[in-house]
A protein has these predicted regions:
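A conserved short beta-strand
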Residues: 99-111, 120
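Conserved alpha/beta-hydrolase "acid-adjacent" motif
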Residues: 15, 115, 130-136
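Serine-hydrolase catalytic machinery in alpha/beta-hydrolase-like enzymes
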Residues: 2-75
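Gly/Ala-rich beta-loop-alpha elbow adjacent to hydrolase catalytic centers
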Residues: 82-92
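Catalytic histidine-centered segment of alpha/beta-hydrolase-like enzymes
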Residues: 154-169
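Short, proline-enriched alpha-helix->beta-strand connector loops that line the catalytic pocket
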Residues: 2, 102, 116-121, 144-146
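Short beta-strand/loop motif that positions the catalytic acidic residue
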Residues: 123-125, 129
Length: 186
């Protein structure tokens, strides 16, 4: 049995392109069980405030913990975490704290994500992401041994405003995602 878990961001739910298409690719690769997490968080002022971001992380982590309590990850032969934004920190923390041997795909990770030393990871980030300092995240990814693909002038949704360019970026991200998913785990 194979499980895929989607960890959304606060404003980026599981039916938005990065998580939607990566989840479909996982299903095509034989992931027969899917869990889509949902969060509730309504406070403003997260950007530029490490304390507020940490508070949001703690709240979302507790919600994820509650939703994953019945998942019984060890029963699965292969576990894949797909995550976006603050969800990348939640997924990395959950894997670390529970010792789950999973693979993770991090879409637009935050610097906080790498505090949990995610393993078996692939990451994607835009250089114009207002939520992540691309230089800091790239340095943290490098120190963690995480392959990170950077997209020039792309924002937190990996978009630039040029629709055709954005579609090409999405296709590139999904091709890399598909290759990572298809690789033999662990």
């Amino acid at each position: 049995m194979k499980l895929v878990v989607c960890f959304p961001g606060i404003g980026y739910h599981c039916d938005k392109p990065l998580l939607y298409y990566s989840r479909k690719l996982a299903a095509c690769a034989g992931y027969d069980h899917t869990l889509l997490l949902q969060y509730t968080y309504h406070k403003d002022g997260l950007r530029g405030s490490p304390a507020a971001l940490r508070e949001a992380f703690d709240t979302l982590y507790a919600q994820a913990e509650a939703q994953l309590s019945a998942a019984d990850c060890p029963q699965y032969d292969d576990v894949l975490f797909l995550s976006k934004s603050i969800g990348t920190a939640v997924s990395a923390a959950f894997a670390q704290r529970h010792g789950i041997p999973c693979r993770q795909i991090l879409y637009t990770p935050l610097s906080l994500t790498f505090a949990f030393a995610p393993q078996n990871v692939l990451a994607f980030l835009g250089t114009a992401d207002p939520w992540s300092d691309a230089f800091s995240v790239a340095a943290a990814a490098r120190a963690n041994g995480t392959p990170l693909f950077l997209y020039e002038n792309a924002n937190h949704s990996l978009e630039t405003g040029d629709v055709l360019h954005d579609l090409a970026t999405l296709q590139d991200v999904m091709q890399k995602t598909q290759t990572f998913i298809a690789d033999t785990p662990h």
